């Protein structure tokens, strides 16, 4: 059965699109037929992070409006087998997204036997975000360990619980997960960031992953590659752990404690 997962956040700049790309890529690496959809109409950043911006011919809105078939709009990833991207439109109005149109596209993807449909939602509560949430079976709420980000995530959780198709039909609610990004144990220790425990206590949803602050993320993004492809990076490893947990595997959380310096590093102040 196809799992529809929305990756969402209360505010921008928390690494939501990076997370969507990494999770989709990781699932495909595990042999799952996966498509990631960009719901951010007008901005379209997912194709840049996935390195396929020059291959966009048709987009999500073209399919909704009947200007293209789903097979024409889907972009097959060149680096990862089983992975497809459905880009957003850069030029169309956000109101071009409709409930019936999104449902039509999702049903077509389900009929194509995708294992996972990852919906990369815009931040906040605009049309794209509401529609990405509405049809989801599961939601990954992406947040930084900062008070403002966590507060906005709490608002998104309210929307997830009340504005979904599942809540309308009074069936099993959307399964919610917390993804904590840009986590820096040193800053947590100094009191400059909330701890993982603090965020869990505030939001009260299960945590699926903790992604450390890592310069490799920006480098990968600029190269048009998903960070999960860089397994030598801490962030890439943490995203892979997250994917494994999403598939039901148990993995200890890494990168949540300050790295202990060796004697020589302490001696030379490095």
From Swiss-Prot:
GO biological process: division septum assembly; negative regulation of cell division
Compartments in which it is found: Cell membrane
Binding site for ATP: 11-18
One Pfam family linked to the record: AAA_31
GO cellular component: cytoplasmic side of plasma membrane; cytosol
Topology in membrane: Peripheral membrane protein
GO terms of molecular function: ATP binding; ATP hydrolysis activity
Annotated Gene3D superfamilies: P-loop containing nucleotide triphosphate hydrolases (3.40.50.300)
Keywords: ATP-binding, Cell cycle, Cell division, Cell membrane, Membrane, Nucleotide-binding, Septation
Complex and partners: Interacts with MinC and FtsZ.
Stated family: Belongs to the ParA family. MinD subfamily.
PANTHER family: SEPTUM SITE-DETERMINING PROTEIN MIND HOMOLOG, CHLOROPLASTIC, SEPTUM SITE-DETERMINING PROTEIN MIND HOMOLOG, CHLOROPLASTIC-RELATED
NCBIfam families: minD_bact, PRK10818.1
Role of this protein: ATPase required for the correct placement of the division site. Cell division inhibitors MinC and MinD act in concert to form an inhibitor capable of blocking formation of the polar Z ring septums. Rapidly oscillates between the poles of the cell to destabilize FtsZ filaments that have formed before they mature into polar Z rings.
Protein name in the entry: Septum site-determining protein MinD
